[in-house]
Amino acid sequence: MAAITQATVEKPIHYPEKLIDTVLTRLPLAEGCHVVDAVYVLYRCLQQTDHHRADIEEYCCELLAMIREHHKPDGGFSYYMGYSQPHYHRVHITYHHPVSDLHGTLLLTWAAAMIRHILGYHDWRIIKP
């Protein structure tokens, strides 16, 4: 996953405005990695520029609605909308059940924390997974 790989590097982002413009062209697929990758790019780019901040905040509100669709009654999140992640790096780990899973919960909680920060709520500490 590109976001986690980049999370370990604390170097300036090249062309943050162009990256923001690219991310804002469409919503990501409603899958854990795609959602967190989009949010992470915006989160990191906003540390260098306020380019399209209002558009980013609106986009993040749409992402929060998408993340809510992954929420399950047990409090966790499913990686896919409606069901758990059956494979991880081509290894079968479970079946398509309508339950939360660890990977989805980690990624979507991290995405929600970054979105809260983007929206001006700094009550959650952003960590690197």
For each predicted feature, which ranges?
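Alpha-solenoid helical repeat architecture
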Residues: 30-36
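Aromatic-lined, polymer-binding surfaces characteristic
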Residues: 1
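Terminal, non-catalytic domain-edge segments
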Residues: 5-24, 36-129
